């Protein structure tokens, strides 16, 4: 038999095996290619997911840091307003100092003319007594009010920013889901039997845009109303602090006159007692006193506040839908009533105490006259002037100071208190809440 015939005969006999082998090899190659493709695709998706998670974390971190900066900028904007409120409520220390200078000039003129018609010395003594009392009241009131204001602002902005972030994330997810549905060919083929998908999509987009615009305006007004709650402590709430502090100062400094002398340690001890007794009245069970200082007690107080901060059109629109506002206020109230908030506010007040004692001590020592370097006791009049200067520094702001580099040292000190940052992070990262919010005290 010829070789060619033997080869053909061999192939014919093993043709089935060859075909099976080739088919198996092709199947293995195809399967391997598919497996490699899906593995690469899975790895790509995993890498993309990790990248997205990292981006989201960085975005959340940047938004958090920006929110804390915005809180500080807000305080810079509010301080000049409250400074005017203090001056209107008879706590303008510069006015008293001006009157003292006028009295000194009048006394000089009276001596030169040998006039006996008036007794400026008595009036001057009254002014010094007034300066002593009001400088103490203003200094302590400023520490409590500004500490509370920066805490309230942090809570407000972190709650609001987190809420906005959640809303935007939900809307983005819904948009992606809708887009995926429209891109699904089978879905489009089925729906095309009873309607034109393009017309339906256009109508839905128009209606959604109108609805979104209306809801966006309502949400914006609700958020503005929520932010305007700081009006309360600047115009009403601080008066509660002022009343408590005034009573404590009158008790602690009773019988201490401007010419009487105290050491820095004695002055610090008396001031410590004032802070301790004030804290005991503010931080009671459930922080009810603190809540009434920071927020209106009832709906009538809330309505009065909103009438002072919103224009007529915005107020009308607000009353048509207050859902978002009520949700935000409920969470803010729960935050204020929590133990964590009490701890943070006490930390801010303690930091304020150390700040003012350091400043008052430096300013008092600096007022020593030549030859008095070893003097350890100072007249209350000297303390009063030092406290006046300290108050001025604590409330000092210039136009755009927070952006231009002119920093209020007191605000910078409070802004760097670690428990405040911890509470802010806790509120901001409370992503377990839904639109109804649920902060745990």
Curated annotation (Swiss-Prot):
Transmembrane segments: 18-39
GO BP: ER-dependent peroxisome organization; peroxisome inheritance; protein import into peroxisome membrane
GO cellular component, one term: peroxisomal membrane
Subcellular location: Peroxisome membrane
Function per UniProt: Involved in peroxisome biosynthesis. Acts as a regulator of MSP1 by inhibiting the ability of MSP1 to unfold target proteins.
Subunit relationships: Interacts with MSP1; leading to inhibit the translocase activity of MSP1.
Name of the molecule in the record: Peroxisomal biogenesis factor 3
GN (gene name): PEX3
């Amino acid at each position: 038999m010829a070789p060619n015939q033997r080869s053909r005969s061999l192939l014919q006999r093993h043709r089935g095996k060859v075909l099976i082998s080739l088919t198996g090899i092709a199947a293995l190659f195809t399967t391997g290619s598919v497996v490699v493709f899906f593995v690469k695709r899975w790895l790509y998706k995993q890498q993309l997911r990790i990248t997205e998670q990292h981006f989201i974390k960085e975005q959340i971190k940047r938004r958090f840091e920006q929110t804390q900066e915005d809180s500080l900028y807000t305080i810079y904007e509010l301080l000049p307003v409250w400074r005017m409120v203090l001056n209107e409520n008879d706590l303008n220390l510069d006015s008293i100092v001006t009157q003292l200078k006028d009295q000194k000039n009048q006394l000089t003129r009276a001596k030169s003319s040998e006039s006996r018609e008036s007794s400026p010395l008595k009036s001057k003594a009254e002014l010094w007594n007034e300066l002593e009392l009001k400088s103490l009241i203003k200094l302590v009131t400023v520490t409590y009010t500004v500490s509370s204001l920066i805490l309230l602002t942090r809570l407000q902005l972190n709650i609001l920013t987190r809420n906005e972030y959640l809303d935007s994330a939900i809307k983005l997810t819904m948009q992606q889901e809708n887009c995926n549905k429209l891109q699904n060919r089978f879905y489009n083929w089925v729906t095309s039997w009873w309607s034109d998908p393009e017309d339906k999509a256009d109508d839905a987009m128009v209606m959604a845009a109108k609805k979104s615009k209306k809801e966006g305006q309502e949400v914006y007004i609700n958020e503005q109303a929520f932010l305007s709650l700081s009006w309360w402590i600047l115009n009403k709430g601080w008066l509660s602090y002022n009343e408590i502090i005034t009573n404590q100062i009158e008790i602690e400094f009773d019988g201490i006159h401007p010419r009487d002398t105290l050491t820095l340690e004695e002055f610090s001890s008396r001031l410590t007692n004032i802070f301790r007794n004030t804290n005991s009245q503010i931080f009671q069970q459930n922080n009810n006193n603190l809540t009434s200082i920071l927020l209106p007690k009832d709906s009538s107080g809330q309505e009065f506040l909103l009438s002072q901060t919103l224009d007529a059109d915005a107020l009308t629109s607000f009353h048509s839908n207050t859902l978002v506002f009520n949700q935000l206020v409920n969470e803010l109230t729960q935050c204020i009533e929590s133990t964590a908030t009490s701890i943070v506010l006490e930390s801010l007040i303690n930091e304020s105490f150390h700040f003012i004692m350091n400043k008052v001590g430096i300013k008092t020592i600096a007022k020593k006259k030549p030859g008095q370097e070893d003097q350890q006791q100072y007249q209350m009049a000297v303390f009063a002037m030092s406290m006046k200067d300290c108050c001025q520094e604590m409330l000092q702001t210039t136009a755009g100071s927070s952006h231009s580099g002119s920093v209020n040292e007191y605000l910078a000190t409070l802004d760097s208190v670690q428990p405040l940052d911890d509470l802010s992070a806790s509120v901001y990262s409370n992503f377990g809440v839904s639109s109804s919010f649920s902060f745990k005290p």
